[in-house]
C-alpha cells in the first residue's frame, strides 16, 4: 500500500492518483479523494469531468457527511470539504481507502471498480465514537459529462429516476458513438432521495466546497 496523510497546510505538492480499471471501465482517484470516471474510452466517453491541471485538484464527484443537529458538514475525503483533522488515504492495486475522524464520527470510504462490469463502488463506513446519539446524513454528488468535455455535452444530458430500481439514470442521446449508453448513480438504502438539478444542490454560483443543499 501507498499511504498519504494530509491536513490543512500539509498536502502533496501536486495531485497523486491511483488508476482503478478493468478492460472496459475505470476511474482515476487522487489523494484528495476527487476523481473522474470513464466507460470504454477514457477521452471520448467520460462519465464525469477530468480536470487537466497539474497543480490544482478538481472533480465532478464528491461525498459529504452532515450532523443534522448542528448543521456541521464535511467530506470523508480531503476534498471538496476538508474537515478539521488529518486524513489518511491508502492506495493499493485495485482500491483506494480514505480514513478520517471528525467530531467523534469515524469514516472509511472504500473505492474500487468491478473486475468485469462497468460499475464503480464507493463503500462508506461510518462509526459514531462520540459517546452520544448523532443524527447523520450522507450525500453523494456526481456531475455528468457523458462525452469528452462537459461544456459540449451539458445541454444534452437528461436525467430521470428509474421506476423499477429507484436509481438515477443519465443519458446523452447526442453523443453519436455512445447514444445508447445509460449511466447510473444508486445508493443501497431504501430511504435515499435523488435530485438531477445541479443548481438545487450547489445553489447559484455555489461550489462543491460549500454547496447550498
Positions of PLM-derived features:
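Anionic coordination/interaction segments
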Residues: 1-213
Amino acid at each position: 500500500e501507498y499511504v498519504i496523510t494530509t491536513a490543512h497546510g500539509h498536502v502533496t505538492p501536486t495531485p497523486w492518483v491511483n488508476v482503478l480499471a478493468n478492460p472496459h471501465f475505470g476511474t482515476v482517484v487522487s489523494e484528495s479523494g476527487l476523481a473522474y470516471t470513464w466507460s470504454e474510452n477514457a477521452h471520448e466517453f467520460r462519465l464525469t469531468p477530468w480536470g487537466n491541471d497539474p497543480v490544482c485538484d478538481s472533480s465532478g464527484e464528491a461525498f459529504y457527511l452532515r450532523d443534522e443537529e448542528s448543521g456541521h458538514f464535511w467530506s470523508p475525503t480531503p476534498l471538496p470539504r476538508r474537515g478539521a483533522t488529518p486524513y489518511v488515504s491508502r492506495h493499493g492495486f485495485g482500491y483506494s481507502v480514505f480514513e478520517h475522524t471528525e467530531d467523534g464520527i469515524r469514516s472509511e470510504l472504500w473505492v474500487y471498480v468491478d473486475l468485469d462490469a462497468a460499475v464503480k463502488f464507493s463503500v462508506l463506513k461510518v462509526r459514531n465514537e462520540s459517546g452520544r446519539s448523532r443524527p447523520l446524513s450522507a450525500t453523494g454528488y456526481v456531475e455528468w459529462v457523458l462525452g469528452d468535455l462537459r461544456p459540449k455535452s451539458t445541454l444534452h444530458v437528461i436525467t430521470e429516476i428509474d421506476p423499477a430500481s429507484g436509481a438515477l439514470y443519465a443519458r446523452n442521446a447526442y453523443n453519436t458513438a455512445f447514444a445508447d449508453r445509460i449511466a447510473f448513480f444508486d445508493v443501497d438504502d431504501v430511504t435515499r432521495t435523488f435530485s438531477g438539478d445541479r443548481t438545487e444542490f450547489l445553489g447559484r454560483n455555489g461550489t462543491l466546497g460549500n454547496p447550498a443543499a
